[in-house]
């Protein structure tokens, strides 16, 4: 039995009347240390405390571990079939744990949530097995692929905004070449960057979202499928047959490449949210004019790609899950569901948006970002409002597959392997390791 009113304790949570009185255990990794400067963890702890204060008859037992320790401990508990009442489920464990009966099927519960219409459905992908949902995606998401460009430099080149097609980027190269600067800076020295910060989004432009979901589900999709090979072919073309990138893209890291942009030696840079925060902070302190000219854009669309031209890869790696054993006590289950819905709901999303310019599962309208500078506001809109989401490849499947693909990608980007060979090796690793 639930009747809702609002209580404000550090932040607003729905104060639902819960019949349960007793212990409820939650295990998570948002330590006090983790929450220092980490908006997602701070928001999680803040809303969790507000929910706890709103329900004095429930004894909320928190088991809080550092992230690395959490991953080890939760795996140990899962192996012993001794998971806590409520815990954070990592996406890559969903399929196996669902098959083992370790996590509750929350499909109907999630669809009955009072916040369901506000949920960003794209975030549920890692926590699906077939059509079933096993968790409420939690904490905050950050993009892995953003084009950061100097609006003034591109204006001088004849573009009011960053080009929406690679063809126009290639045309702009001629202008920037005459200026003695690179068109776009990129660093793949660590081998993972070409996957996380480029192919994961470019691939979506060719394959669409269902293909990668099928790959996750072992539903028949293959790395050797024509659409994915086309994405590899375009990647090789852009890096080996055009001159739009810095020559040393395969030997320098993203940290090196972003310095080319900061120094003005490149007119744009492609990287992730971690690069954006560094670039913005550095330029804000050192070059206010260049800081104010920061612009954000999605990857340009290839000429032969037919899928969503506005996609960028962003996701939430964990979800709030519930131990099926909790269902033995319906009142306790209602409390666990209420907790899961509140720590991922509008109270959390509003808090992280207004305090950190971040977003979570629940979309929030009319967020007041006025206290943030324009660049921060623009990046919030890029990340959560103005673009569509696709998956971060290496958040799924397993590292053995991506180690093979990443190594071969780097070789391909040196012109020493064909896209077909890369695809065949990736498929072989997939079949052997997943």
Positions of predicted regions on the chain:
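Conserved N-terminal structural module of periplasmic/extracytoplasmic solute-binding proteins
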Residues: 1-99, 115, 421, 425-434
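Hinge/lid segment of periplasmic solute-binding proteins
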Residues: 12-16, 66, 91-146, 170, ...
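Extracytoplasmic/periplasmic substrate-recognition and gating elements
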Residues: 53, 157, 241-242, 284-356
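Short helix-initiation/N-cap motifs at beta->coil->alpha
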Residues: 64-73, 166-170, 247-262
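Short, solvent-exposed loop/beta-turn-alpha elements that line the ligand-binding surface or hinge
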Residues: 107-119, 205-230, 282-289, 301-311, ...
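Extracytoplasmic/periplasmic solute-binding protein
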Residues: 129-140, 145, 170-220
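Glycine-centered hinge/linker elements that transmit conformational signals in sensory
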Residues: 173, 217-249
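C-terminal capping/gating helix-and-loop segments adjacent to ligand/active sites or protein-protein/ligand interfaces
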Residues: 217, 314, 355-365, 377-434
């Amino acid at each position: 039995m639930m009747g809702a009113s609002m209580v404000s304790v550090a932040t607003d949570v729905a104060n639902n009347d819960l019949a349960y009185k007793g212990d409820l255990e939650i295990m998570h990794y948002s330590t006090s240390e983790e929450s220092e400067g980490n908006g997602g963890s701070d928001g999680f702890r803040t809303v969790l405390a507000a929910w706890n204060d709103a329900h004095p008859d429930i004894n909320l037992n928190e088991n809080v571990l550092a992230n690395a320790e959490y991953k080890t401990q939760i795996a140990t508990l899962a192996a012993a079939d001794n998971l806590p009442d409520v815990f954070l489920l990592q996406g890559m464990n969903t399929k196996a744990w669902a098959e083992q009966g370790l996590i509750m099927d929350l499909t109907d519960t999630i669809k009955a949530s009072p916040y369901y219409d506000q949920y960003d459905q794209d975030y549920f992908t890692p926590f699906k097995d077939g059509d079933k949902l096993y968790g409420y995606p939690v904490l905050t998401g950050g993009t892995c692929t953003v084009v950061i460009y100097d609006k003034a430099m591109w204006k001088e080149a004849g573009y009011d905004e960053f080009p929406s097609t690679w063809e126009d980027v290639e045309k702009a190269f001629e202008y920037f070449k005459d200026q003695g600067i690179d068109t776009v800076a990129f660093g793949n020295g660590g081998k993972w960057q070409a996957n996380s910060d480029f192919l994961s989004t470019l691939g979506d432009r060719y394959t669409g979202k269902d293909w990668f979901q099928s790959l996750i589900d072992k539903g028949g999709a293959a790395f050797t499928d024509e659409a994915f090979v086309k994405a590899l072919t375009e990647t090789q073309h852009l890096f080996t047959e055009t001159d739009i990138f810095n020559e040393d893209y395969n030997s320098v890291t993203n940290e090196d490449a972003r310095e080319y942009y900061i120094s003005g030696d490149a007119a744009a840079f492609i990287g992730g949210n971690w690069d954006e925060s560094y670039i913005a902070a550095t330029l804000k302190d050192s070059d206010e004019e260049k800081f104010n000219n920061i612009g954000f854009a999605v990857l340009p669309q290839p000429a032969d790609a037919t899928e969503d031209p506005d996609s960028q890869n962003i996701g939430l790696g964990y979800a709030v899950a519930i131990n099926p054993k909790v269902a033995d006590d319906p009142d306790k289950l209602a409390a666990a569901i209420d907790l899961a819905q509140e720590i991922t709901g509008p109270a959390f999303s509003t808090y992280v948006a207004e305090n950190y310019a971040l977003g979570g599962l629940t979309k929030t309208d009319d967020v007041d970002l006025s206290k943030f500078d324009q660049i921060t506001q623009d990046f919030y809109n890029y990340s959560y409002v103005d673009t569509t989401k696709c998956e971060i490849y290496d958040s799924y499947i397993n590292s053995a597959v991506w180690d093979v693909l990443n190594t071969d990608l780097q070789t391909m980007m040196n012109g020493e392997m064909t896209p077909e060979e890369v695809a065949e090796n990736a498929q072989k690793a997939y079949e052997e390791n997943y």
